[in-house]
């Protein structure tokens, strides 16, 4: 009897887990859970073990070629490159077939995204300009965490109109494109010509695979792995390889199959339930030891938090409103400016993307206090934006 009861409980738990992973908000919830666990570990008696685990040396060697990184660097440079493969595929799909496929569809979220990148950077610069050592952090509040923002919106999925969801997705995708450009232009150092040549050859092979509409995903994975390793060695940030790989996968194969859709379907679950939660676990572990009230007035913390809480909504809403009034763009049917403002606030959730940019802007040499304060600023700004964004979205969709 007890044995049957255990089996029944086991089946019930499995069904609950399956039901959870089918939720639209499951990725966002898991992301938040991972961040909370990381913060708890970083401020517990297990903090040393947590940090030692993240700094475990991990090496990959094939003949004379080797990559030696700590575990956290493998997560940030390797796993996040896989995430950017997914981003690249999503951007390509939207550009050719989706919400960004026509000028009329693309211009409104594009202008909004530009405002959402420029104004947060200006807000950051205005607050942090007194300290030249903080100059590199201007890009941190530019980013939007797609998974988290969509996760919050999914909590109100039945109330939110479809055009508003499409606007958020298009806005976040263009935002990611901006982040990719920033990484390429400002966070690539000490370039290796030899590695860049290998990268160029790999890119040419990917272009040929795409040109001949090769559907075998293993071919893109093998060449993509070579491209990633070459880009990593070149001094350009390795996540850019992910975007190139994503763009190289064809929308349609020779026999009408859809390799991009197939690969996107595979990676979407890995990204939501493994890669992003793992990234949050590795990067959200902020230790509060030695932190006092005076740190709240730190220019770095204030600059990042203000960029996310104030800069994002002001930039997105302001540019959107002005573009419509000047006749440069048209407000999508079925949504109003109050809802645009709610989404603009929601886009202040920088979280994993902002932490990623912070890890590039301030390396280990910047000092523990700088890294801690930057992560605190991101957590504060993202948390406030998530709460306010949810409340505004709930109110505006309810009124609608």
From Swiss-Prot:
Q: Where mainly located? A: membrane
Give GO MF terms, alphabetically. sodium:proton antiporter activity
The record describes the protein's role as: Na(+)/H(+) antiporter that extrudes sodium in exchange for external protons.
State the family it belongs to. Belongs to the NhaA Na(+)/H(+) (TC 2.A.33) antiporter family.
Q: According to the lineage, what is the superkingdom?
A: Bacteria
The record's keywords, sorted A to Z, are: Antiport, Cell inner membrane, Cell membrane, Ion transport, Membrane, Sodium, Sodium transport, Transmembrane, Transmembrane helix, Transport
Q: Which gene encodes it?
A: nhaA
Does this UniProt record's set of keywords contain Cell membrane? Answer: yes
The Gene Ontology biological process annotation of the record reads: regulation of pH
Compartments where found: Cell inner membrane
* Segments traversing the membrane: 26-46, 71-91, 107-127, 137-157, 166-186, 189-209, 225-245, 273-293, 299-319, 340-360, 373-393
Q: Mind telling me which NCBIfam families this protein's record contains?
A: NhaA (TIGR00773), PRK09560.1 (NF007111), PRK09561.1 (NF007112)
Topology term for the membrane: Multi-pass membrane protein
Catalyses:
Na(+)(in) + 2 H(+)(out) = Na(+)(out) + 2 H(+)(in)
Name under which the protein is recorded? Na(+)/H(+) antiporter NhaA
User: For this UniProt entry, what's an example GO CC term?
Assistant: plasma membrane
Q: Native species of this protein? A: Haemophilus influenzae (strain ATCC 51907 / DSM 11121 / KW20 / Rd)
**By its UniProt entry, which Pfam families does this protein fall under?**
Na_H_antiport_1 (PF06965)
Keyword rRNA-binding: yes or no? no
């Amino acid at each position: 009897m007890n044995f049957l009861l255990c089996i029944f409980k086991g089946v019930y738990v499995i069904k609950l887990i399956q039901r959870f992973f089918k939720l639209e908000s499951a990725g966002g919830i898991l992301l938040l859970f991972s961040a909370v666990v990381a913060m708890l570990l970083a401020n517990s008696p297990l903090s040393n073990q947590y940090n030692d685990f993240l700094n475990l040396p991990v090496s990959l060697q094939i003949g004379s070629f080797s990559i030696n990184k700590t575990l956290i660097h493998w997560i940030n440079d390797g796993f996040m490159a896989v995430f950017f493969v997914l981003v690249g595929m999503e951007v390509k799909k939207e550009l050719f077939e989706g919400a960004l496929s026509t000028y009329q569809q693309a211009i409104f979220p594009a202008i909004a995204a530009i405002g959402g990148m420029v104004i947060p950077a200006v807000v950051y610069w205005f607050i942090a300009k007194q300290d030249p050592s903080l100059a590199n952090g201007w890009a941190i509040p530019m980013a939007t965490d797609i998974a988290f923002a969509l996760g919050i919106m999914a909590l109100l999925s039945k109330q939110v109109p479809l055009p508003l969801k499409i606007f958020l997705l298009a806005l976040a995708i263009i935002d990611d494109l901006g982040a990719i450009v920033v990484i390429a232009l400002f966070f690539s150092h000490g370039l290796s010509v030899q590695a860049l040549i290998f990268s160029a050859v790999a890119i040419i092979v990917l272009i040929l695979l795409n040109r001949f509409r090769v559907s075998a995903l293993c071919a893109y994975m093998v060449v993509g792995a070579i491209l990633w390793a070459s880009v990593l060695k070149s001094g350009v940030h390795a996540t850019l390889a992910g975007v190139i790989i994503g763009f190289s996968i064809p929308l349609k194969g020779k026999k009408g199959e859809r390799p991009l859709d197939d690969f996107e379907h595979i990676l979407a679950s890995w990204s939501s339930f493994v890669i992003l939660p793992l990234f949050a676990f590795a990067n959200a572990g902020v230790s509060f030891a030695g932190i006092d009230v005076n740190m709240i007035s730190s220019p770095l913390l204030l600059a990042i938090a203000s960029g996310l809480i104030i800069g994002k909504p002001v930039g997105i809403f302001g540019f959107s409103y002005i573009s419509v009034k000047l006749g440069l763009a048209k407000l999508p049917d079925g949504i109003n400016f109050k809802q645009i403002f709610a989404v603009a606030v929601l886009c202040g959730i920088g979280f994993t993307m902002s932490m990623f940019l912070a890890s590039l802007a301030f390396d280990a040499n910047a000092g523990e206090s700088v890294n801690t304060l930057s992560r605190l600023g991101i957590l504060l700004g993202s948390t406030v934006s998530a709460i306010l964004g949810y409340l505004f979205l709930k109110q505006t969709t309810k009124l609608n």
